[in-house]
Amino acid sequence: MDENKKRALSAALSQIEKQFGKGSVMRMGDRVIEAVEVIPTGSLMLDIALGIGGLPKGRVVEIYGPESSGKTTLTLQAIAECQKNGGTAAFIDAEHALDPIYAAKLGVNVDDLLLSQPDTGEQALEIADMLVRSGSVDIVVVDSVAALTPKAEIEGEMGDQLPGLQARLMSQALRKLTGNIKRSNTLVVFINQLRMKIGVMMPGQSPEVTTGGNALKFYASVRLDIRRIGAIKKGDEIIGNQTKIKVVKNKLAPPFKQVVTEILYGEGISREGELIDMGVEAKLVDKAGAWYSYGDERIGQGKDNARTYLRDNSQVATRLEAELREKFQPAEAPREAGDDEDKE
């Protein structure tokens, strides 16, 4: 760059800093690139699949899937992990369906959990924005986008046609929220539902679509698709679900990784079940017939007994987890690639 251009650029940068404050514009080389702070999900498999060890702070995350697939369970486990590390969590319950007894079973400290049950979508998103701007909340969960009903719809008559109202509300809210989320380093998780597009018959095209328009797809740094794929039985009794979680979008690590984990009723994601499955895959746990062995020790006949053994012997489980983390530990998060999609 010639001297005249350098002087012109220097003058422009000085003017920008004077008008908008120091750090408004900076060279990438002058900026300290730090590893992204994360909140663990409560699932070791998913933390590794995300590539950064959990859900990224200072970002928007979308978790979507069919009904009863484990969306709220996953967010409550992330809240529990956040609280274990001394963080503050907020849950905006637009569906008015949070069960505090179930949340407590998953390890959530319900006495310290900030809960809001707003009347309208505008109120829910305004509360989320105020909590984010306070800079004192580590994770805010909005459950769910589908339940964020615009005020005009609530005040209108049943059957009124108000096309695109919720999509416009989400687009406007996310434009306002994203800057505040980055500045306050808060993780904001939106739970979303699936709907079916009528008339989609093209091969290769999915008829499924998430609610609330396209804005959330663009603004989210991570999108997780969670689905129930089978039942877990103990004898004839169903005790949980086999669940597949796919990382559909990831701006901080390679996407499209997927994991199959177990969600047990009244317990949440089975940590011990994951340790056994990952241990077998990593050849740290031997499986001979129905027997599972770790080191020189037999830990159980059948997965359910092995799971119980690890639950009762926490030192063994902790040692196995440490070995698995060492083997699968994700590398430090790379710099984020520029997202060239236009935000709408």
Curated annotation (Swiss-Prot):
Its main location: cytoplasm. Residues 323-337 have a biased composition (Basic and acidic residues). GO terms for cellular component: cytosol. It is found in: Cytoplasm. It comes from the Bacteria. GO terms for molecular function: ATP binding; ATP hydrolysis activity; ATP-dependent DNA damage sensor activity; damaged DNA binding; single-stranded DNA binding. Keywords: ATP-binding, Cytoplasm, DNA damage, DNA recombination, DNA repair, DNA-binding, Nucleotide-binding, SOS response. The keyword Nucleotide-binding applies. Gene3D superfamilies: P-loop containing nucleotide triphosphate hydrolases. One of its GO terms (biological process) is DNA recombination. ATP binds at residues 65-72. Residues 323-344 are annotated as: Disordered. Pfam families: RecA, RecA_C. SMART domains: AAA. InterPro entries: AAA+_ATPase, DNA_recomb/repair_RecA, DNA_recomb/repair_RecA_CS, P-loop_NTPase, RecA-like_C, RecA-like_N, RecA_ATP-bd, RecA_C_sf. Belongs to the RecA family. Can catalyze the hydrolysis of ATP in the presence of single-stranded DNA, the ATP-dependent uptake of single-stranded DNA by duplex DNA, and the ATP-dependent hybridization of homologous single-stranded DNAs. It interacts with LexA causing its activation and leading to its autocatalytic cleavage. This is Protein RecA. It comes from Xanthomonas axonopodis pv. citri (strain 306).
